[in-house]
Amino acid sequence: MLLIPILCFSQDFQGKAYYMSKISVDKSWMDNPRFASRKSYMNDMIKRNTEKDYLLEFNSTESTYKEIEKLETEGQGFNWMANYVGENIGKIYKNAQDKISINETEMMGKFFLVTEDLENTKWKMSGESKNIGQYTCYKATYTKQVEEKVFTFGTWNQNNQTNQNKKPKKMIDVEVVAWFTPDIPVSSGPSWYQGLPGLILEVSDDKTTILCTKIVMNPKEKTKIKRPKKGKTISNQDFVALQDEKRAEAVEMWRSRQKRQSSTARLR
């Protein structure tokens, strides 16, 4: 049995945890000569969508997790790649007492409140520990089933995406590895991760790694954590189906644009 020391905090304590998230992406398709002129642009676009910074604000029972927005370079235009890579995270609200999560997010100009019960995750403690900054962290794991996704944007998407949409979704087992610290006794963490006896400072999930870079306990400026209310309430299952529909539309738009560019090139 693993014994973990728990520090005591007052019930009204607050904190802020800053995280950086990175998704591994297959970029082998960029070696294709047809993409040579746009390689720099595509690399920048991929980085924008796979390397992000987030802020988790928390108290003893509630938390909100949102992206720290970066200034966009003028002329970047519509970020079509956001339809392919990563999670559609707007602002995730988690309430450990009410056992509910709400993702306040936007898609195609419309706001949604993606609402679901907090997952009763069957974490397994390994007994391993390590330090992350000044905090002693302990390892916990669990296995979940997710839809298999191939993060590539070249000929695979252009030629095969339509056929892929007609096939049944392939589910695979993915091991989630988390490192949490009982020094901060809140059952929360980045993204949707929660359910451990301490704040999660690091988590890896297949192609995604999220790492805490800074923690501020009891900041001078207190933030009141509020339950999101902006948008249409929708279940996660229905929202995922809507995402798939819009993603397919974005793919078709991209393919049409490629055909027009190819036709223009032949006429010159």
State what each model feature region is:
Residues 1-2:
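Sec-dependent signal peptide recognition
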Residues 12-268:
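Extended soluble regions of mature proteins
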Residues 6-10:
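Sec/Tat signal peptide C-region and signal peptidase I cleavage site
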